[in-house]
Structure formats: structure tokens, C-alpha cells
């Protein structure tokens, strides 16, 4: 058993998004992404299905050119290889669930290139 908090020990950065793997299980990786208002994660794809959960804040979640407004508590799922982007409309905490087969380093590269 493991216990983590997505809302404790927050270290937002005004210059870049902050990612942290908070939990890894036999089937998934749970990543926290901290975004300041206005920060953009440029369009990218995931090689496996993902789940995005807005823990706090508001995000414009672009999927193949269509913007979906996500607010605190909302979740969205995407199949593999679907282009998507995120724009923080307010300071936001995002929970990203990756397949165990996916790499957290891939997410870090997307953030670094955004």
C-alpha cells in the first residue's frame, strides 16, 4: 500500500511547469503537473492511453484542435497517439495517469519543450 497527496508540498515555478511522479504501481504511473496561470504544454501525443484529472484550477484542454474547458474535479481520457495540449487558465494541479509501459521522462521532455 502507498499513500500520497496531490495537494501537499506544492512547489509552483513561475518560469516552467513542474512534474513529479508521486506514485508508481504495477499498472500505472501517477504524475502531478503544476501549472501557473498562462503556462502552456504544447501539442504532443502519448504512446499509450492516458487519464487527465484536474485536482485544482482550470485548464483549456485542446484535442485535435477542439478546446475542452476542464475545471476542478473534471477528468478526461484519451486513446493513444491523440494530439493534445494544455493551457492553464488559473494556477492548476493536474493528475496525469500513465500506463506502466509509458515513460515519465517523456512527459518531462514535453514540458521542457513547451
Regions found by a protein language model. Give the residues of each.
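A short, N-terminal "cap"/entry segment at the start of jelly-roll beta-barrel domains
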Residues: 1-27, 111-114
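Conserved short histidine dyad/triad with adjacent acidic residue
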Residues: 29-46
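Glycine- and acidic-residue-biased ligand/ion/polar-headgroup-sensing regions
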Residues: 48-59, 64
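A cytosolic small-molecule/anion-sensing beta-strand core signal
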Residues: 55-56, 71-72, 90
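Short acidic-glycine-tyrosine-enriched beta hairpin
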Residues: 65-80
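Ligand-binding loop in jelly-roll beta-barrel domains
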Residues: 80-103
Amino acid at each position: 500500500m502507498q499513500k500520497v497527496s496531490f495537494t501537499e508540498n506544492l512547489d509552483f515555478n513561475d518560469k516552467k511547469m513542474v512534474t513529479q511522479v508521486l506514485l508508481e504501481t504495477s499498472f500505472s504511473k501517477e504524475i502531478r503537473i503544476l501549472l501557473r496561470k498562462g503556462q502552456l504544454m504544447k501539442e504532443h501525443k502519448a504512446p499509450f492511453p492516458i487519464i487527465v484529472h484536474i485536482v485544482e484550477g482550470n485548464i483549456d484542454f485542446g484535442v485535435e484542435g477542439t478546446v475542452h474547458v476542464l475545471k476542478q474535479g473534471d477528468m478526461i481520457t484519451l486513446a493513444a497517439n491523440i494530439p493534445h495540449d494544455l493551457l492553464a487558465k488559473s494556477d492548476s494541479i493536474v493528475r496525469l495517469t500513465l500506463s506502466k509501459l509509458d515513460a515519465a521522462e517523456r512527459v518531462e521532455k514535453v514540458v521542457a519543450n513547451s
